Curated annotation (Swiss-Prot):
This is Prolyl endopeptidase. Its main location: cytoplasm. It catalyses: Hydrolysis of Pro-|-Xaa >> Ala-|-Xaa in oligopeptides. Cleaves peptide bonds on the C-terminal side of prolyl residues within peptides that are up to approximately 30 amino acids long.
Length: 710
């Protein structure tokens, strides 16, 4: 590999912070100011090295051309019914943003209802959340620009898709819940702050409030319905009960699956919604999660993990809400995790379980909880569902590593409940029958069995020669289920690659127990699980360290960076997207404080001692052995990422280049690409997605000497 000349970067050796008696040097703290001329110059100097490096990768053009060709397939969501009309999202293939269509009936002509593509020249304005009024006649929708979490809410009259003048600003992480009379909507916003709020700022997000907006009035007249002045981190999202009588307020403090649950009986608000609501504190602790399903009068059905880490379904009668009086409707499964529930056709419950990282879909009786039917499903994931209490039909969407998507429709008024294929998509150019998916269970360091999916061409020899791409996440109770990825299948097809996805601890694959096994004091388990996945792939002959790439984003960016520090000998290439790299300071920026539920916080001495051991920024060291260097590393971030602010990646790359990059033995590149008009990933336009994956796989090909197979 050619040796790269990294920029000379100023180190402020006087920037030292004391953590519980430990002096920690932070020489690149000046990179925390995104607006300083110095930071802008740093970003420009880094991009000046990285962009040509990526553009000179021999296969980049071939990869981008193939990606553009194969990604050009139709993408549909499930149909969903609102009032008397049906709606669905559709992307013809390469549109930057998907378009919302409306139909008067399932057989009727489809018309464009909302096309976000016309809101910007480059596709960087995206739809972020929407809500229809109960009768389906009004539509509220959130827009975000350049990938930021900040949202502007606008309104439309559905008939004729007529734009209304109402606009709501300073909205972020918000609910959108209409009262059933269609007069207005609950939403969340943050107080005004100094400086800008466009997604390039790093200021912390505290004191979120709940407001009610009356349609046709100015935002300045909105009614404050809930606030928590003594609890700045609390966030309270509202939803209306199915009968429209109750407002349910779900209060969260971080990212743990726990919430308080308060409610207000709107019939008790004699003057309507006119101020802080009369909240009844049904659950006033953070000891479990309560997810509203439906209610019959005062008997409310919830999905909960209270004393049931795999979740169960319970009934609570608001007239007699003592925990000892709760009734179990569907008990917790000993192994499978209940992911979500919906009530449909007034007396049915649809339950979706996760069984060894594969979905199961069931129909139960709302009154007795009894199982009525299990829907037939291949091995894969349910990625879409629609069907509410007043509907008599459901739609659900299935996908897997080798199937882009099948949408099923089931009419629940029929005697025999047989789902039919409503729509099936194929991708021309990738023949699924040439490939196979296997799921294996490998032992981690402490003996725990970890599931991993492996996708490869049929009939390959396990001789250690294949390039492999290992992906992981491992945090925040999020399960990584099979999904269809054209970019990764191109790697398998045209780069002779092996795709592996490791379902490490910290995720939700086996419920709250699995999540707790990879957070706080147990965070090292995530890194051990992932390193053992790599060792399994090598031992079984799928790949070898020099041919192995690891990849993750956000919490997964932290994962792959920590693994590179701990085992630089185990990987050939590391691609860390929008990663959390400074574990001592993450809680100070934007919404970082919410992640302390998974990571802890350096303000605590005990937590500091966990964090400083694995924080990527604080554990970069030149490997001692002469024949070991750091893998090739590419960090990806963006100027409008206000979820994981770019300073994490900027400080980490400066540290890598200084400590490792100056060494003679480090011939593998250590690079960063900072994108513009992009954020953490939600709403990213197709054109940017194609550029990003072309960069990633071109980097892999160049660094690991992978040839293109036509």
């Amino acid at each position: 590999m050619l040796s790269l000349q990294y920029p000379d970067v100023y180190r402020d050796e006087t920037a030292v912070q004391d953590y519980h008696g430990h002096k920690i040097c932070d020489p690149y703290a000046w990179l925390e100011d995104p607006d300083s001329e110095q930071t802008k110059a740093f970003v420009e100097a880094q991009n000046k090295i990285t962009v040509p490096f990526l553009e000179q990768c021999p296969i980049r053009g071939l990869y981008k051309e193939r990606m553009t060709e194969l990604y050009d397939y139709p993408k549909y969501s499930c149909h969903f019914k609102k009032g008397k009309r049906y709606f669905y999202f559709y992307n013809t293939g390469l549109q930057n943003q998907r378009v919302l269509y409306v139909q008067d009936s399932l057989e009727g002509e489809a018309r464009v209802f909302l096309d976000p593509n016309i809101l910007s020249d480059d596709g960087t304005v995206a739809l972020r959340g929407y809500a229809f009024s109960e009768d389906g006649e009004y539509f509220a929708y959130g827009l975000s620009a350049s990938g930021s979490d900040w949202v502007t809410i606008k309104f439309m009259k559905v008939d004729g898709a007529k734009e209304l003048p109402d606009v709501l600003e300073r909205v972020k992480f918000s609910c959108m819940a209409w009262t059933h009379d269609g007069k207005g909507m609950f939403y969340n916003s943050y107080p005004q702050q100094d400086g800008k709020s466009d997604g390039t700022e790093t200021s912390t997000n505290l004191h979120q409030k709940l407001y009610y907006h009356v349609l046709g009035t100015d935002q300045s007249e909105d009614i404050l319905c809930a606030e928590f002045p003594d609890e700045p981190k609390w966030m309270g999202g509202a939803e209306l009960s199915d009968d429209g009588r109750y407002v349910l307020l779900s209060i969260r403090e971080g990212c743990d699956p726990v919430n308080r649950l308060w409610y207000c009986d709107l019939q008790q608000e004699s003057s309507g919604i006119a101020g802080i609501l009369k909240w009844v504190k049904l659950i006033d602790n953070f000891e479990g999660e309560y997810d509203y399903v439906t209610n019959e009068g005062t008997v409310f059905t919830f999905k909960t993990n209270r004393q049931s880490p795999n979740y169960r379904v319970i009934n609570i009668d608001f007239r007699d809400p003592e925990e000892s009086k709760w009734k179990v409707l569907v008990p917790e499964h000993e192994k499978d995790v209940l992911e979500w529930i919906a009530c449909v056709r007034s007396n049915f419950l649809v339950l979706c379980y996760l069984h060894d990282v594969k979905n199961i879909l069931q129909l139960h009786d709302l009154t007795t909880g009894a199982l009525l039917k299990t829907f037939p499903l291949d091995v894969g994931s349910i990625v879409g569902y629609s069907g509410q209490k007043k509907d008599t039909e459901i739609f659900y969407q299935f996908t897997s590593f080798l199937s882009p998507g099948i949408i099923y429709h089931c009419d629940l008024t029929k005697e025999e409940l047989e789902p039919r294929v409503f729509r099936e998509v194929t991708v021309k150019g990738i023949d699924a029958s040439d490939y196979q998916t296997v799921q294996i269970f490998y032992p981690s360091k402490d003996g725990t069995k970890i599931p991993m999916f492996i996708v490869h061409k049929k009939g390959i020899k396990l001789d250690g020669s294949h390039p492999a791409f290992l992906y992981g996440y491992g945090g925040f109770n999020i399960s990584i289920t099979p999904n269809y990825s054209v970019s990764r299948l191109i790697f398998v097809r045209h780069m002779g690659g092996i795709l592996a996805v490791a379902n490490i601890r910290g995720g939700g694959e086996y419920g709250e127990t699995w999540h707790k096994g990879g957070i706080l004091a147990n965070k090292q388990n995530c890194f051990d699980d992932f390193q053992c996945a790599a060792e399994y792939l090598i031992k079984e002959g799928y790949t070898s360290p020099k041919r192995l790439t690891i990849n993750g984003g956000s919490n997964g960016g932290l994962l792959v960076a920590a693994c590179a520090n701990q085992r630089p000998d185990l990987f050939g290439c590391v691609i860390a997207q929008v990663g959390v790299m400074d574990m001592l300071k993450f809680h100070k920026y934007t919404i970082g404080h919410a992640w302390t539920t998974d990571y802890g916080c350096s303000d605590s001495k005990q937590h500091f001692e966990w964090l400083v051991k694995y924080s990527p920024l604080h554990n970069v060291k030149l490997p001692e052995a002469d024949d070991i260097q750091y893998p090739s590393m590419l960090l990806l971030t963006a100027d409008h990422d206000d979820r994981v602010v770019p300073l994490h990646s900027l400080k980490f790359i400066a540290t890598l280049q200084y400590i490792v990059g100056r060494s003679r033995k480090q011939s593998n590149p250590l690079l960063i690409h900072v994108d513009t008009k992009a954020g953490h990933g939600a709403g990213k336009p197709t054109a940017k997605v194609i550029e990003e994956v072309s960069d990633m796989f071109a980097f892999i090909a160049r660094c690991l000497n992978v040839d293109w197979i036509p």
